[in-house]
From Swiss-Prot:
EC number: 6.5.1.2
CDD domains: BRCT_DNA_ligase_like (cd17748), LIGANc (cd00114)
Annotated function: DNA ligase that catalyzes the formation of phosphodiester linkages between 5'-phosphoryl and 3'-hydroxyl groups in double-stranded DNA using NAD as a coenzyme and as the energy source for the reaction. It is essential for DNA replication and repair of damaged DNA.
Source organism of this protein record: Gluconacetobacter diazotrophicus (strain ATCC 49037 / DSM 5601 / CCUG 37298 / CIP 103539 / LMG 7603 / PAl5)
NCBIfam families the UniProt entry points to: dnlj, PRK07956.1
Protein known as: DNA ligase
Gene of this entry: ligA
PROSITE patterns xref list: BRCT, DNA_LIGASE_N1, DNA_LIGASE_N2
Cellular-component GO terms for this entry: cytosol
C-alpha cells in the first residue's frame, strides 16, 4: 500500500515491520558479508520508511532505521571505536529528490535563494565495496577498522597493511592524528580471477565482488588477504587534529599528495542540472567501468558548511547518495503461504517459480497483508511482476495482464481467519491491516519465535542457541518459556547425548547460558519482545528508569489510564502514547508477570544499566525561544542534542536551561518565574563550545 493511503494505525504497524526487516538486512550485509537483497531493494525499503515517517512524524520509532546504522563488529576481530562515527548516507532517486536535499540543507543553514543556488557539490561514484577507516599518527599508519555499527568496527589493521593502495607512511606534512575514510573493493577482473581459483579449489564462489572484497578483508590470516588483489579509493576524513583544507575538493587533492588513490571520475558540480548530467554520464559509463558502482555521492564542498550541517540520525545533512533504479522481472505465482511471527502477525508470502533478478535467484516475495493482496488482486497461477526493492524477500508490483488466449484466472485468495499453526482464531482489530493469531503463548509458532528473539544478538545473545536448536529443544519439551533457557545447564548430560551434540558442545552451551545470567537492563527489556519496543526504545526506558525494580514498579502503575506514571511514560522522548499503550498492555497480562517473576528468580542481576553520557549537556532539558541570529533553530537543536541534551518546545519545572534569542516572550517570563537558568545566544555559543561569531 502506498504511504499516502495508510491510516495512522496502519502506518504504525508498517513502521514496526520495516524496522525489523531493515535490521535483519543490516545484519546480513554488515556482519555476515552475505546480503540477501540488492542495494536497490534495500534503498526502496528505507525510502518507504522515510515516506511514512514524513507523513506521520509522531510515529517515528526510537529504533527507526532512519536514526541508526546497523551492523555489530564481529567477535573474531578486536574492536576499535571510531573517533568520529562512520555513518550511512540517505538516498535519492531523481533530480526532484536531489533538489529537495539541497533545499533542506539551505533551509537548515538559513541561506536565501541566491546563496542556495551558489552551493557547490563534489560528485563521486559510489563504490559498492566495504567502508573502512584508516588512522594515522604523525603520518604513520597505526590502525584500520571496518565501519561496523558506525560507532566501533573490526580491527583489520594487519590485513589492510597488505593493500598496495594503503600508504604505510603519508607523503609530506600531515596532522598529528587523522582518520581517513575509504572504500575497499575488488575490480571485476580480480573478482573473476578469485572465483576461478575458488572453483578450481572446489570451494563455493562468491556471489558478487562486494562479498568477495568483504570476505577477503576479514580473513583471520593476513597472508590470504595479501593474495587477493584488493583496491581502495580514499574519499573523506573522519577526525583530524588539524584542518588540512577548506573544501572537500581540496581535501581530495591532499589525499592524492599523501599517496592515496582517489577516484579519477570525481568532479565538482554547481547546480542540480549539472548533478543530473553527471549522473546520466555515469549511468552510461557504468557497464564499462572495472568496478561496481550503485550510484553517485554528492557532498557539500565547503567544509565549514559541512561542520554546521552536521548529522541527523544515521546520516550527514551535507551529503546524499543518488542511486540507480531497481531491477525487475516476471514470473509465476504458484501458491500463497501464511507465516506466523512472534507477536502473532499472519504474513502472506508468495511462492514463485524461480527467476533471476539482478543475478539473484528469487523464489519468494512478500505480499504484506490482506489489503495488499486485494488491492493488487494477486491470485495463484498469475504471472506477476516482481522487484527486488526493499524487503527481506522481494515484493510483487502487480499482475501481468493475461493474454486473450490465456486460461481463466484462479480464485481470489481468501485470507485465513484461523492460525495455520495452532488453529486458534485470528483477529484483525479495527483500523489495522494485520491479522493476528489469538493463541498467544499456546501457539507453537509464537513461542518459538519469541524464544529466538529472546536469545538474539541484541537481546541475551547466547552462543549455541540458534533457530534450529531452539526449534528442536521446544519440540522435545526442553524449552517452553524464556526461563527454561536458564534451566538448560540442569540438562547438560542429556543434551550431550543428542544427535549432533557432545560433551564439549553441551558444556559450551552451559557456559554461554550462565555467562548471560547477568544482563544489562536495556537488553533485558528488548528481549521480552514487547510490541514496538526495539533496541533504542529499550535503551530509552533503561536510561529513564535506571533499574529493573523501578521500571517494573512504574510500569505496573502505568497500567492505569490517566495515572501520573502513564502520562510520564508517554512523555519520554521517543516513546509516545502508542508505545506507552503497548507497555501497559504487556504488564496487564498475568502470564507476562509470571514470566518476569520466573526470569528474575533465575537471573543474578539485571540492574545497574551502564549508559554513558553523550556530552556535557547529557541529561539536561533545553528550550530555545525567540529568534537566533547566528544559527537557525534546527542547527541549535542539533548542536544541543549532539551534546546529550533533550530539546523541548515548552518550559516546565523539568527544564534545565532556556536559551533566549531576540523577542523571547512568554517562555522567558516563565523561566524567570520558575527560577530556571537562562543564557543569551552568545552565552549559548560559549557553553556549546562554538565560540564567538567573527571579529
Amino acid at each position: 500500500m502506498d504511504p499516502s493511503e495508510l491510516t495512522e494505525p496502519q502506518a504504525m504497524v508498517e513502521l514496526e515491520r520495516l524496522a525489523q526487516q531493515i535490521r535483519a538486512l543490516d545484519r546480513a550485509y554488515y556482519e555476515d558479508d552475505a546480503p540477501t537483497v540488492t542495494d536497490a531493494e534495500y534503498d526502496a525499503l528505507r525510502q518507504r520508511n522515510l515516506a511514512i515517517e514524513a507523513r506521520f512524524p509522531d510515529l517515528r520509532r526510537a529504533d527507526s532505521p532512519s536514526l541508526h546504522v546497523s551492523g555489530a563488529p564481529s567477535a573474531a576481530f578486536g574492536r576499535h571505536r571510531h573517533l568520529v562515527p562512520m555513518l550511512s548516507l540517505d538516498n535519492v532517486f531523481g533530480r526532484e529528490d536531489f533538489e529537495s536535499f539541497v533545499t533542506r540543507a539551505a533551509r537548515f543553514l538559513g541561506l536565501n535563494d541566491d546563496q542556495a543556488r551558489a552551493l557547490r557539490f563534489v560528485a563521486e561514484p559510489k563504490i559498492d565495496g566495504l567502508s573502512i577507516s584508516l588512522t594515522y599518527e604523525h603520518g604513520r599508519f597505526v590502525r584500520g577498522t571496518t565501519r561496523g555499527d558506525g560507532t566501533e568496527g573490526e580491527d583489520v589493521t594487519a590485513n589492510l597493511r597488505t593493500l598496495r593502495d594503503v600508504p604505510l607512511r603519508l607523503k609530506g606534512p600531515a596532522p598529528a592524528l587523522i582518520e581517513i575514510r575509504g572504500e575497499v573493493f575488488l575490480s571485476k577482473p580480480a573478482f573473476l580471477s578469485i572465483n576461478a581459483a575458488q572453483a578450481e579449489a572446489g570451494q563455493k564462489p562468491f556471489a558478487n565482488p562486494r562479498n568477495a572484497a568483504a570476505g577477503s578483508l576479514r580473513q583471520l590470516d593476513p597472508n590470504i588477504t595479501a593474495r587477493r588483489p584488493l583496491s581502495l579509493f580514499a574519499y573523506a576524513q573522519g577526525f583530524s587534529s588539524d584542518r588540512v583544507a577548506d573544501t572537500h575538493w581540496d581535501y581530495l587533492e591532499r589525499l592524492r599528495q599523501w599517496g592515496f588513490t582517489v577516484n579519477p571520475l570525481s568532479c565538482v558540480v554547481e547546480s542540480a542540472e549539472a548533478a543530473e548530467a553527471f549522473m546520466d554520464r555515469i549511468a552510461r559509463e557504468r557497464s564499462g567501468l572495472e568496478y561496481d558502482i550503485d550510484g553517485v555521492v554528492y557532498k557539500v564542498d565547503d567544509l565549514a558548511l559541512q561542520d554546521r550541517l552536521g548529522f541527523v540520525g544515521r546520516a550527514p545533512r551535507w551529503a546524499i547518495a543518488w542511486k540507480f533504479p531497481a531491477e525487475q522481472a516476471i514470473t509465476r505465482l504458484t501458491r500463497i503461504d501464511i507465516q506466523v511471527g512472534r507477536t502473532g502477525a499472519l504474513t502472506p508470502v508468495a511462492i514463485l517459480e524461480p527467476v533471476n533478478v539482478g543475478g539473484v535467484i528469487v523464489t519468494r516475495a512478500t505480499l504484506h497483508n490482506e489489503d495488499e493482496i486485494a488491492r493488487k488482486d494477486v491470485r495463484v497461477g498469475d504471472l506477476v511482476q516482481i522487484q527486488r526493492a526493499g524487503d527481506v524477500i522481494p515484493q510483487i508490483l502487480g499482475v501481468v495482464p493475461p493474454g486473450a488466449d490465456a486460461p481463466p484466472r484462479g480464485e481470489a485468495f481468501i485470507f485465513p481467519h484461523t492460525c495455520p499453526i495452532c488453529g486458534a482464531r485470528a483477529e484483525r482489530p479495527p483500523g489495522e491491516v494485520v491479522w493476528r493469531c489469538t493463541g498467544g503463548l499456546t501457539c507453537p509458532a509464537q513461542v518459538v519465535e519469541r524464544l529466538i528473539h529472546f536469545v538474539s544478538r541484541d537481546a541475551f545473545d547466547i552462543d549455541g542457541l540458534g533457530e534450529r536448536t531452539i526449534t528442536e529443544f521446544h519440540a522435545d519439551g526442553l524449552l517452553k518459556t524464556p526461563a527454561d533457557i536458564f534451566r538448560l545447564p540442569d540438562h547438560e548430560a542429556d543434551i550431550a547425548t543428542r544427535e549432533g551434540w557432545g560433551t564439549v558442545s553441551a558444556r559450551n552451551l552451559t557456559a554461554s547460558v550462565r555467562a548471560r545470567q547477568t544482563i544489562p537492563l536495556a537488553r533485558f527489556i528488548y528481549a521480552l519482545g514487547i510490541r514496538r519496543i526495539g533496541t533504542s526504545n529499550a535503551r530509552l526506558l533503561a536510561r529513564h528508569y535506571g533499574s529493573y525494580t523501578h521500571w517494573r514498579e512504574q510500569m505496573l502503575r502505568a497500567t492505569t489510564i490517566g495515572s501520573d506514571e502513564r502520562l510520564a511514560l508517554g512523555s519520554i522522548t521517543g516513546i509516545g502514547g502508542a508505545i506507552a499503550d503497548e507497555l501497559a498492555a504487556f504488564f496487564m497480562e498475568a502470564h507476562n508477570l509470571e514470566t518476569l517473576d520466573d526470569l528474575t528468580a533465575m537471573l543474578t542481576a539485571i540492574e545497574d544499566e551502564d549508559l554513558p553520557a553523550q556530552g556535557h549537556l547529557s541529561g539536561k532539558t533545553v528550550v530555545f525561544t525567540g529568534t537566533l541570529t547566528t544559527m537557525t533553530r534546527p542547527e541549535a537543536k542539533a548542536i544541543a542534542e549532539r551534546l546529550g541534551a533533550r530539546v523541548t518546545d515548552s518550559v516546565s519545572k523539568k527544564t534545565d536551561l532556556v536559551v533566549l534569542g531576540a523577542d523571547a516572550g512568554s517562555k522567558a517570563r516563565k523561566a524567570a518565574e520558575l527560577g530556571i537558568d537562562t543564557l543569551d545566544e552568545e552565552g549559548w555559543r560559549e557553553l556549546a563550545g562554538i565560540g564567538p561569531v567573527g571579529p
